């Protein structure tokens, strides 16, 4: 059957369960950067329901919310905390501005880190984020 659900490693299943229980926005991707899950709190910040964003690849989620720095310069996948966590396999933290799907501009603080099953087996990454106070421009 071609449309079978993707089987995920137990670590990712547990991470998804953990994220589903948090009030803090959480975004979870696999090792290729495809969206596995984001919780209801993330839905409110992003302006998109998980069912509409499930399976987005890294290229899509890294651009659809128009991430930029405080000066308005676009921030590409390679410089986004989740991109760093996937590509370089180490934690990263950054302040960003995004535009949610409903057009609301938000300033968020993001911390992302890779998820390992074993020291040399990165399964994906998780980003925890929250709305941050607006900086003086």
What are these regions (language model features)?
Residues 2, 121-132:
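PAS-family sensory domains
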Residues 6-34, 40:
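Sensory modules in modular signal-transduction proteins
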Residues 13, 136-137:
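Sensory-domain boundary/capping and coupling elements
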Residues 43-44:
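Sensory helix hotspots in PAS and closely related PAS-like folds
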Residues 53-100:
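Terminal output helix/cap of sensory domains in signal transduction proteins
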Residues 77, 105-107, 124:
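Beta-strand residues that line the small-molecule/cofactor-binding core
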Residues 93-97, 107-110, 126:
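PAS/PAC sensory module
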